[in-house]
């Protein structure tokens, strides 16, 4: 928070001063904070600050090509002189990555080029495309829960989810609770969503390397992407 001068700041009656609040690109993906202005008469004025500090990858894979999800555990194996073996896990959760191809035409091609130019090295909100569900009923703006059975899907409390219509029409929401075939949200939805809207769990992830864009025509391009999760992805010891 930048103020025009040194604190404490004197204000005359009806005087206007501009305070500049800057949010950096580095830090937790979800911004949830309060700035409090304290006045000499004991009054306080609170400013709610919320939002997201990341972009979403909103273009689905090219489903004519395989999508590969990889889980990588790390275990230390020690063999004693007597021949006994001791295995010690070195990771609480496996490293998780996804690799898939995309095919983009016209508007989608422009979106891919701009998104990669602007955000390649930073953290993305990556949908887990294979766990997609569709809304069975309209979702009003300001909704605080989504009716969906999340059993066996990658929705997690504290993680993000995406409501999706197309590459430019989507909304990221934060999951607060999962129970009784409903997902409770930490903040209300900002717009209404019709029946058939896709709902996907998201994980924060980074591109492992800069993709090489292949142009097939002046409108059509393709590339291969590999993302690695930046958040812990707890995994059950057995398949659900």
Stretches with model-predicted labels:
Residues 13-17, 27-31, 90-96, 106, ...:
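Solvent-exposed loop and beta-edge segments used for protein-protein assembly and interaction
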Residues 1-3, 60-63, 133-140, 172-175, ...:
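A structural signal for short, hydrophobic beta-strand segments that form beta-sheets
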Residues 103, 107-191, 234-239:
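Autoprocessing Asn-cyclization modules and mimics
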Residues 40-108:
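N-terminal intrinsically disordered, low-complexity, charge/repeat-rich segments that act as generic
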Residues 73, 87-106, 209-240:
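Oligomerization/assembly interface segments of phage tail-like spikes and tubes
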Residues 180-204, 222-233:
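Short solvent-exposed strand/turn elements
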Residues 1-55:
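Feature for long, exposed domains in two main contexts
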Residues 25-27, 165-171, 204-205:
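Short, charged beta-turn/beta-strand-edge "cap" motif at the junction between a beta-strand
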């Amino acid at each position: 928070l930048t103020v025009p001068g040194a604190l404490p700041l004197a204000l005359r009656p009806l005087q206007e001063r501009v305070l500049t609040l800057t949010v950096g690109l580095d830090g937790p993906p979800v911004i949830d904070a309060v700035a409090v202005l304290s006045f000499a008469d004991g009054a306080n004025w609170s400013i709610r600050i919320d939002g997201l500090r990341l972009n979403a990858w909103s273009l689905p894979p090219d489903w004519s090509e395989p999508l590969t999800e990889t889980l990588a555990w790390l275990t230390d194996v020690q063999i004693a002189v007597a021949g006994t073996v001791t295995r010690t896990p070195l990771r609480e959760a496996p490293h998780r990555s996804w690799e898939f191809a995309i095919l983009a035409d016209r508007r989608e091609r422009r979106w891919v080029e701009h998104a990669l130019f602007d955000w390649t090295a930073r953290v993305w909100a990556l949908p887990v495309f294979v766990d997609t569900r569709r809304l069975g009923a309209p979702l009003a703006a300001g909704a605080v829960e989504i009716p969906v059975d999340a059993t066996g899907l990658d929705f997690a409390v504290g993680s993000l989810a995406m409501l999706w219509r197309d590459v430019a029409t989507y909304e990221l929401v934060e999951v607060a609770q999962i129970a009784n075939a409903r997902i409770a949200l930490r903040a209300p939805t900002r717009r209404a969503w019709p029946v058939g809207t896709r709902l996907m769990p998201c994980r924060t992830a980074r591109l492992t390397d800069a993709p090489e864009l292949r142009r097939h025509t002046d409108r059509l391009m393709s590339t291969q992407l590999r993302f690695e999760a930046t958040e812990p992805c707890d995994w059950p010891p057995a398949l659900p």
